C-alpha cells in the first residue's frame, strides 16, 4: 500500500509542476538564457580585443618614436667620434713613417744560416791543421841539391827580398779576406816559391798569422748584432739519416 501511495503522490507532483510550468515554456526559457549569456560573452570579448589593439598601436607608435630619436642621437655622436678617430689614425700612421729608419740593403751572403754556422768551425779546424802541417812537410819534400858550403853573403839579400815579398802577399791576402764575406772567407796558405832551383825554401814566420784575430773578432761582433730592418729566416734542417749522403763536402782551400 505504501508503495502505491508514494507512486501516486509522485504522479500528482509531476502533474502539478507541468501545470505550473509547462515543458514548452521551460525549453524556451533555457534557450533565452543561453542566448543572453553567449551574447554577453561575445560583447566582452569584442571590447577586450578592441582595447588590446588600441594599446598595441600606442606601444608601437611610442617605440617607433623612441627608436628614431635614439638612432638620430647615436648617429650624431658617431659622426664626430669617427672623424676624430680617422684623424688620430692618420697621425699615428704618419708618425711611424717619420720614425722608421732607412734600411740598408744587405747582400744575401751576409745572412748566415744554421748549416753555414755549423760548417764554419769545422773548416777553421781543418785549415788550422793543414796550415800547421804544411810548413813542416815542405822543407822535407823540397829538393836539397844546393851544397851546404854556400857563402852567407849570397843568401842574405835573396832571403830579405823573399821575406818582403811574403809580407806583401800576406798583407794583400788580409785585405782580400776583410773585403770578402765571412761565409766565403777561408784561411789561405801559401807555398813559398823557391828563388832558384838549388835553393832551399825558407819557412814562413809563424808569428804572422794570415787570419788576424782583431779582424775575426770584429766580424763575429758584426754577425752577432741583430739587424732590425730585415729578419733572418731560419734554415730548414733535413733529417740527417745515416743512409743519406752529407749535404756539403769539405770546403776547398784556395792556394796562391
Curated annotation (Swiss-Prot):
Keywords, alphabetical? Cleavage on pair of basic residues, Cytoplasmic vesicle, Glycoprotein, Proteoglycan, Secreted, Signal, Synapse
- Which InterPro entries does the UniProt record give? NESP55 (IPR009434)
Pfam families listed in its UniProt record: NESP55 (PF06390)
Annotated signal sequence is 1-46
Task: Indicate where this protein resides in the cell.
Answer: Cytoplasmic vesicle, Secretory vesicle, Synaptic vesicle; Secreted
GO CC annotation: COPI-coated Golgi to ER transport vesicle; cytoplasm; cytosol; dendrite; endosome; extracellular region; heterotrimeric G-protein complex; membrane
Q: Which stretches does UniProt call biased (Basic residues)?
A: 225-236
A GO BP entry is: multicellular organism growth
**Chain intervals with Acidic residues compositional bias:** 104-139, 206-216
Q: Where are the residues of the annotated region Disordered?
A: 61-256
According to its UniProt record, how is this protein modified after translation?
Answer: Binds keratan sulfate chains.
Residue ranges under compositional bias (Basic and acidic residues)? 86-103
Tell me the protein's name: Neuroendocrine secretory protein 55
Source organism per entry reads Rattus norvegicus (Rat)
Q: What is the lineage of its organism?
A: Eukaryota, Metazoa, Chordata, Craniata, Vertebrata
Amino acid at each position: 500500500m505504501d508503495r502505491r501511495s508514494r507512486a501516486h503522490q509522485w504522479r500528482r507532483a509531476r502533474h502539478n509542476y507541468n501545470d505550473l510550468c509547462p515543458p514548452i515554456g521551460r525549453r524556451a526559457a533555457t534557450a533565452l538564457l543561453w542566448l543572453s549569456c553567449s551574447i554577453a560573452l561575445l560583447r566582452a570579448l569584442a571590447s577586450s580585443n578592441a582595447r588590446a589593439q588600441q594599446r598595441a598601436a600606442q606601444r608601437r607608435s611610442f617605440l617607433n618614436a623612441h627608436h628614431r630619436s635614439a638612432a638620430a642621437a647615436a648617429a650624431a655622436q658617431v659622426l664626430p667620434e669617427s672623424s676624430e678617430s680617422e684623424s688620430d689614425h692618420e697621425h699615428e700612421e704618419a708618425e711611424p713613417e717619420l720614425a722608421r729608419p732607412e734600411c740598408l740593403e744587405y747582400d744575401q751572403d751576409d745572412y748566415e744560416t744554421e748549416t753555414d754556422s755549423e760548417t764554419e768551425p769545422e773548416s777553421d779546424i781543418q785549415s788550422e791543421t793543414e796550415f800547421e802541417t804544411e810548413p813542416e812537410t815542405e822543407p822535407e819534400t823540397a829538393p836539397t841539391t844546393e851544397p851546404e858550403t854556400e857563402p852567407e853573403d849570397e843568401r842574405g839579400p835573396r832571403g830579405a827580398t823573399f821575406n818582403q815579398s811574403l809580407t806583401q802577399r800576406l798583407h794583400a791576402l788580409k785585405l782580400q779576406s776583410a773585403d770578402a764575406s765571412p761565409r766565403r772567407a777561408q784561411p789561405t796558405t801559401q807555398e813559398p816559391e823557391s828563388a832558384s832551383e838549388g835553393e832551399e825554401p825558407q819557412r814562413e814566420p809563424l808569428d804572422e798569422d794570415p787570419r788576424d784575430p782583431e779582424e775575426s773578432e770584429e766580424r763575429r761582433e758584426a754577425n752577432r748584432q741583430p739587424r732590425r730592418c730585415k729578419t733572418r729566416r731560419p734554415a730548414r734542417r733535413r733529417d740527417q739519416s745515416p743512409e743519406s749522403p752529407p749535404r756539403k763536402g769539405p770546403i776547398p782551400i784556395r792556394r796562391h
